[in-house]
């Protein structure tokens, strides 16, 4: 089943990097009582994700937060160390929370996983943006093609706030 507007996020664990090292955070800990702009990419450091999607998020981060968003988060099916390196490279001001979905548990649980085995990536997340309020999906913008950022960028979600 694919998640849709009005659905509650499932209970899944992410890995996040903190000052004390890698930590486990549940969807409840991340989303409960908060307004969260969640962006998902197929892979850290991949061309579209790195050169198009992340810049659309970081460029619009201040404006998104000014619209009442508590947290801007980015998730990908990568391990926490890759996500930390990607954050260091794309978001040195730490405007976003990077959520490692290493085994695609979240992507699969919400039905937004994609099999990219043919190009050598394996199971990944579809590219999307989502506005979540207190764990409930309020906006959802899923790309039809994982190689483009036409409706999942920071500018699109900003316009929906």
Predicted stretch roles:
Residues 1-161:
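Chalcogenol-based redox active-site neighborhoods
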């Amino acid at each position: 089943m694919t998640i849709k507007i009005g659905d509650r996020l499932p209970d899944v664990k992410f890995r996040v990097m903190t000052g004390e090292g890698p930590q486990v955070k549940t969807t409840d800990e991340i989303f409960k009582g908060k307004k969260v702009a969640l962006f998902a990419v197929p892979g850290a450091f991949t061309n579209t994700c790195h050169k198009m999607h992340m810049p659309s998020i970081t460029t619009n981060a201040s404006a998104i937060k000014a619209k009442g968003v508590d947290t801007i988060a980015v998730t990908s099916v990568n391990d926490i160390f890759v996500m930390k390196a990607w954050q260091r490279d794309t978001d040195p001001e730490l405007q976003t929370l990077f959520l490692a979905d290493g085994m695609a548990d979240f992507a699969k649980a919400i039905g937004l996983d994609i099999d990219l085995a043919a190009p050598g990536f394996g199971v990944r997340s579809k590219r999307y943006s989502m506005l979540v309020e207190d764990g409930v999906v309020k906006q959802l913008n899923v790309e039809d093609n994982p190689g483009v950022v036409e409706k999942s960028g920071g500018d699109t979600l900003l316009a929906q706030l």
